[in-house]
Amino acid sequence: MDLLLLLFSAIWYILPAYIANAVPCILGGGRPVDFGKNFFDGYRLIGNGVTYRGTFFGILFGIITGILQHFIVILYMDPESAFNYGLSGYIILSFLLATGALFGDMLGSFIKRRFKLNQGQSAPLLDQITFIVFALLFAYPFYPLPINTIILLLVISPLIHLSSNIVAYKLHLKKVWW
């Protein structure tokens, strides 16, 4: 497969997870999913950065992304292409990817708290990779990918994540650039 097509296919597949992971930065806030509770080690379970509102809107916008992808395929691509999962397929896939991404983000926050890292402190790769790993784990049993696509996503996702965080920081949507 041509490298450019592989790159496009990988990003197209994972796009609902990327959107779901980005939206809470903009539309989050409110009650944290851990209700402000501490783990037995005395540190927060997850922290204030992961909220019900952010999680809800992350999943919602992930699903909306999947629905838009469906209509883009119908209107602008070959309906017989590998990208055509059908509307229900896109809704299910985008829900799985978005939910997996946000679960991975929560797990990453939980792990950071165990290492006594506060919200906003950098944890290289943990911040950039857990959301993508869990998005893939949630979706893979129903919508499997070839191994070369998975490897590509694991390589490019930290770069895309870092780039988008820098943009969000410059737009004053994030307090730190990482």
UniProtKB/Swiss-Prot annotation:
A Pfam match: CarS-like
Cofactor(s) listed in the protein's UniProt record: Mg(2+)
Record-level GO BP terms: glycerophospholipid biosynthetic process
Pathway(s) of this molecule: Membrane lipid metabolism; glycerophospholipid metabolism
Class of the enzyme per the UniProt entry, highest EC level: transferase
The name this protein goes by in its record: CDP-archaeol synthase
Gene Ontology CC entries for this record: plasma membrane
Organism: Methanococcus maripaludis (strain C5 / ATCC BAA-1333)
Gene symbol of the encoding locus: carS
Catalysed reactions, as listed in the record: 2,3-bis-O-(geranylgeranyl)-sn-glycerol 1-phosphate + CTP + H(+) = CDP-2,3-bis-O-(geranylgeranyl)-sn-glycerol + diphosphate
Residue ranges of the TM segments: 3-23, 56-76, 91-111, 136-156
Compartment(s) of residence: Cell membrane
Function, as annotated: Catalyzes the formation of CDP-2,3-bis-(O-geranylgeranyl)-sn-glycerol (CDP-archaeol) from 2,3-bis-(O-geranylgeranyl)-sn-glycerol 1-phosphate (DGGGP) and CTP. This reaction is the third ether-bond-formation step in the biosynthesis of archaeal membrane lipids.
Lipid metabolism is among the record's keywords: yes
Family according to the record: Belongs to the CDP-archaeol synthase family.
Keywords from the named record: Cell membrane, Lipid biosynthesis, Lipid metabolism, Magnesium, Membrane, Phospholipid biosynthesis, Phospholipid metabolism, Transferase, Transmembrane, Transmembrane helix
InterPro entries reported in the protein's UniProt record: CarS (IPR032690), CarS_archaea (IPR002726)
Membrane-related topology note: Multi-pass membrane protein
EC identifiers of the protein: 2.7.7.67
Example GO molecular function: CDP-2,3-bis-(O-geranylgeranyl)-sn-glycerol synthase activity
